[in-house]
Amino acid sequence: MKAIAYRGGVVTFRIPAHWREEYSDLEGGTFYEDRPDSGTLRLKVITVVAPKPLQSCSAMDVLHVVVNGMKSKGVEGTTSGRNDGNAVFKYELNSEEGVRHTIFNWIVANPIPPNRARVATFSYTMLASQRNRSQVQRDLEMLDAEIKATSFSERLGVVAE
């Protein structure tokens, strides 16, 4: 496994050592095994700002705001708090147009008092036909554990690379 210090360490997580990395200012980070039909992990990070300081904004509160609209459109998932004060919303989507894909998503909320929060969105896209392969299941278990262990810089903003 190798550590990824995304945007200089704003978000840090691990991926398999042999996976490739690509970065774009617009598209965020892309991580994948260099083989045909491999799954692709993507990461985007935003910082949200509340108009005034919040009394006790928790990561669960941030997730509620971020995913409330998704849930009203029928997206179902699981939300869990973490011991470090962050929280994760995990859900799955399936594309029905063209080549069928399954997309696993993790939204990780990181509150930054008094009135900001980082939201890291990880998505892992794969061919739907590969969903039940044992290697894919192992990759998903590994990604789930590593994403849930994601850490964030205490500094606000993009850390210089």
Where on the chain are the PLM-derived regions?
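Secretory pathway targeting signatures of secreted, lumenal, and periplasmic proteins
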Residues: 2-64
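Short glycine-aromatic motifs
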Residues: 19-20, 75-78, 150
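Short beta-strand element of the conserved SAM-dependent methyltransferase core
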Residues: 31-36, 43, 91-93, 104-109, ...
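Short, surface-exposed beta-strand/loop "edge" segments at domain boundaries and coil↔beta transitions
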Residues: 37-44, 52-55, 96-101, 128-134
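Glycine-rich, often proline-containing surface loops adjacent to acidic residues and nearby aromatics
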Residues: 39-47, 85-88, 117-124
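Signature of long, low-cysteine stretches enriched in small and polar/charged residues
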Residues: 63-115, 157-161
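Surface-exposed amphipathic alpha-helical segments
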Residues: 121-161
